[in-house]
Amino acid sequence: MPRSRINGNFIDKTSSIVANILLRIIPTTSGEKKAFTYYRDGMSAQSEGNYAEALQNYYEATRPEIDPYDRSYILYNIGLIHTSNGEHTKALEYYFRALERNPFLPQAFNNMAVICHYRGEQAILQGDSEIAEAWFDQAAEYWKQAIALTPGNYIEAHNWLKITRRFE
């Protein structure tokens, strides 16, 4: 049974009904419908913490999805799951792939910056300040891009950039 039919709460059920109506009304190809169904089911599984199921649905959604904008969000969500699972190298790969298709995803830049910042902190703990600075510099570049896309957001990152004198 598709996940969209087993969601338990009112909002999920309502969203599923609205999405199904829109899929019938809006002219879309069968591939687009299939991709959307997998994407929706992936989001539902992800919100419940079922990451393996979410990944499976997202991977399935990438097959029929040809629109680069829509595909970017699928790839971004795959990156989120890999981040949650501590698979930072894989997460960075998927954030990069999402940004190749849609360079206006500030949340992808932010998440990449967070991973780089984390790696910088890990390098400090290992006593490698040179590597740490390289990671922090990379984090700064990603945060600058996120802030440029959405001025006023990412206040903590903005403050970190100022405190560390990485903001120009």
From Swiss-Prot:
Its main location: plastid. It comes from the Eukaryota. TPR repeats lie at residues 35-68, 72-105, 120-153. Keywords: Chloroplast, Membrane, Photosynthesis, Plastid, Repeat, Thylakoid, TPR repeat. It holds the Pfam family TPR_1. It is a peripheral membrane protein. InterPro entries: PSI_Ycf3_assembly, TPR-like_helical_dom_sf, TPR_rpt, Ycf3/AcsC/BcsC/TPR_MFPF. Signal peptide: none annotated. It is found in: Plastid, Chloroplast thylakoid membrane. Belongs to the Ycf3 family. Essential for the assembly of the photosystem I (PSI) complex. May act as a chaperone-like factor to guide the assembly of the PSI subunits. This is Photosystem I assembly protein Ycf3. It comes from Phalaenopsis aphrodite subsp. formosana. The gene is ycf3.
